UniProtKB/Swiss-Prot annotation:
Cell compartments where the protein resides: Cell membrane
A GO term from the CC aspect: plasma membrane
Residues spanning the membrane: 7-29, 68-87, 94-111, 121-143, 150-164, 179-201, 206-225, 358-375, 382-399, 409-431
UniProt-recorded name of the protein: Uncharacterized protein YfdI
Topological relation to the membrane, as annotated: Multi-pass membrane protein
Species for this entry: Escherichia coli (strain K12)
Keyword set, alphabetical order: Cell membrane, Membrane, Transmembrane, Transmembrane helix
Top-level taxonomic group: Bacteria
Amino acid sequence: MNKAIKVSLYISFVLIICALSKNIMMLNTSDFGRAIKPLIEDIPAFTYDLPLLYKLKGHIDSIDSYEYISSYSYILYTYVLFISIFTEYLDARVLSLFLKVIYIYSLYAIFTSYIKTERYVTLFTFFILAFLMCSSSTLSMFASFYQEQIVIIFLPFLVYSLTCKNNKSMLLLFFSLLIISTAKNQFILTPLIVYSYYIFFDRHKLIIKSVICVVCLLASIFAISYSKGVVELNKYHATYFGSYLYMKNNGYKMPSYVDDKCVGLDAWGNKFDISFGATPTEVGTECFESHKDETFSNALFLLVSKPSTIFKLPFDDGVMSQYKENYFHVYKKLHVIYGESNILTTITNIKDNIFKNIRFISLLLFFIASIFIRNNKIKASLFVVSLFGISQFYVSFFGEGYRDLSKHLFGMYFSFDLCLYITVVFLIYKIIQRNQDNSDVKH
């Protein structure tokens, strides 16, 4: 295939994806402030009428004014400082376009690490697979200011770095791992996951790899330790809207210090409901104000008292009612993704219909399979991505319980999609390899 034609087709595909997704975005559920507070005035929450064109502050606050330490926030800050030289506005559509271009390239990097795209059939195979990875549930993140979007770009790059064996890949590994692990508290286990792969399956240059993983882990711990503002809410939800509620619903004996009347009520007095997500009450913030002393260790008491919970929790009725890529916030009628409905929205709906209740168990199967696979490329990819996805389930639940679990499980959903993508690419690679071997034998 002529290189100019190949590049033209690739650019055309990227532009089609960007055009289809330009009006698909995410609701601000009061979390945008963590990333944009020093840069622009507060973006209205719970409104579907955002302009996506935001005026920058006349004087951008210093970078140390962030209360929530996140690699995403610092990347956004750097971007805004640069564009402020030329404009007074942050255009979320333009920013999301750049991010989509990088995301598609990360998928292309994984694909070409197995299969060369010198023929039309292989290039269009990539287009089909990449298109399926561009659902509204994924691309809508780029028009928001949620830290989770870091995973969309840097998890594929992390996978690519694991499958290459050169100094450049080691540098890519470091930056990808550092950015993911410091993007949000719930990604803290990522360095340990990568390190466990190296310990058990790939000890080549283990000292360098160990240093990388330790540095990233320490950076993540630092980010968590110096972040402010949301910890008390998370601890309350992890217990009274999480572990205690699970124990109550399953007939387990709760600790004597638990206030039964507050179990199942979030910090604003919304009562958990499987059918509706939640229902309003007149309690308000009374329960939260009375139990600000809760700890994450209290939430983990569930695992200590009932170890079988680690196997049962993913199949809990309350949890399964949250398995939905068309995310909702607390109330099931309050959809997080909004905008133009098109084929990208259809992909999200199809994924929900087919994979709704099997994503977790599928990730577990991917993980088990990775242990026995001989090919080191696919082994590394599936081991790390599946274990990352599994970890996201437990960190999300024990980090904030059932509250907003639908969106908090984004990392698990995307990991499942990426495992499928990698597996299909690998199977196509094996088919091509077998056909080439048969052709060589005939000649």
